Amino acid sequence: MTTQVQPKDKTVTVNGLKLHYLDWGSEGSPVMVLLHGLRGHAHSWDDVSVAMCQDYHVLALDQRGRGDSDWAKDGDYTTSAYVSDLLGFCDALKLDKFILMGHSMGGRNSMSFAGRHPQQLEKLVIVDVGPTLDSRGSERISQEIRQVPEEFDSFEAVVEYMSKQNRFASDAVLRRRLQYSTKELPNGKIGWRYDVAIREQRRQGTVPPSEDLWPLLPNITCPTLIVRGKETDILSPEVAQKMTETIPASQLVEVERAGHMVFEDNPGDFIAALKGWLS
């Protein structure tokens, strides 16, 4: 998707960390905050941000350890840490009654935030994740992270390596994803921009236990959209259905020709479903 719309790079300091975010303008319009997934970043949402920024004040956050935000000095990448960051982000920007949309890890963080601070949200969108993960997908992602090289000879080498894990997204979308996921290292090679601690925790088996989100779901009082990629290996149909039965004002939509990276795999249908629900 090509566009002349360009976001402003901004930062805010929360919990001692400089957090970077993309401000897509339209101040005064309803606020929409976007949270990326485990290996994502604020630019993961670019197609969605461009499509929504005419009607919404879109803020796409680089969560701690990702993109241009600081790495957590203590290696704390727990749900409670992300939720605390989001709360501080909202306080710093004086956000209230906003739309929150999160994908994967960002979706779990969104559910936790919504279950604890329901009064702050106007609407909630959970993208391809649930309180319980399909073991096929969670093991696939953990294995990919454990096995990924720490450095590559060139950006093209990164694209070639990661394209083997890419099922649906276009080459242009994959390249954009990797452009903002990598950086040039002092030795001239290309490495990952997100915190090495996130990879090491998976290699060493020291990932903190996941928070049980099921007890929080009944607390989510705002209208909620659950989006599932038809070909996903992360959010099972059974868990998605249970979520709609547990979150009071919720609705489920499935996007065809999409796996776990729903809005990158099929941005057109994802955006159409999102706009349809919001209207």
What kind of feature is each model-predicted range?
Residues 1-32, 54-56, 95-96, 248, ...:
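Alpha/beta-hydrolase fold catalytic core
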Residues 17-68:
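Conserved HGGG/HGGXW glycine-rich cap/lid loop of the alpha/beta-hydrolase fold
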Residues 43, 63-79, 135:
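Glycine-rich "HGGG/HGxG" loop immediately N-terminal to the catalytic nucleophile
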Residues 96-136:
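Conserved hydrolase catalytic core segment
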Residues 132-194:
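Helix-rich cap/lid subdomain of alpha/beta-hydrolase
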Residues 185-245, 251:
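Conserved serine/cysteine hydrolase catalytic core
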Residues 258-267, 271:
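Catalytic histidine-centered segment of alpha/beta-hydrolase-like enzymes
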